[in-house]
Amino acid sequence: MFNTLLAVFIGGGVGSMARWLVSLKLNSASAHLPVGTLIVNLVGAFIIGLTLALFSRMTHIDPVWKLLITTGFCGGLTTFSTFSVEVVYLIQEGKLTWAAGTILLNVAGSLAMTMLAFILVNNFASQ
């Protein structure tokens, strides 16, 4: 149990630091679209899809690594709460089109990235 908790703790810490650094660097790039949040959500969606697809095929790998990457790192990297508050701010500022675009890009983009990761692993594994 300790190894499991430690893996989630380490992964979450690294993911959270990565999210903060990306947001710090990229959110100022656009006054309307929180680019950093979008990037971490899309990258996190891809990583979790890739990890789950790989682990379903590579059952010999210790499941603690899966927890470190998915629950820990991806949980720390991706951010629904920041995404939510950024959309609310856009709505409060009357930027309804930007708010809708942010929602669409984050939700549809994250689903597409997760699906892409599964497709890539399945195509690679079938060769």
Curated annotation (Swiss-Prot):
Q: List, alphabetically, the GO terms of the cellular component aspect.
A: plasma membrane
- Coiled coil region boundaries: none
Substrates-to-products reaction catalysed: fluoride(in) = fluoride(out)
Query: What is the regulation of this protein's activity?
Result: Na(+) is not transported, but it plays an essential structural role and its presence is essential for fluoride channel function.
Q: Which NCBIfam families match?
A: crcB, PRK14196.1
- Stated role: Fluoride-specific ion channel. Important for reducing fluoride concentration in the cell, thus reducing its toxicity.
Q: Which PANTHER family does its entry note?
A: FLUORIDE EXPORT PROTEIN 1-RELATED
UniProt protein name: Fluoride-specific ion channel FluC 1
Taxonomic source organism: Yersinia pseudotuberculosis serotype I (strain IP32953)
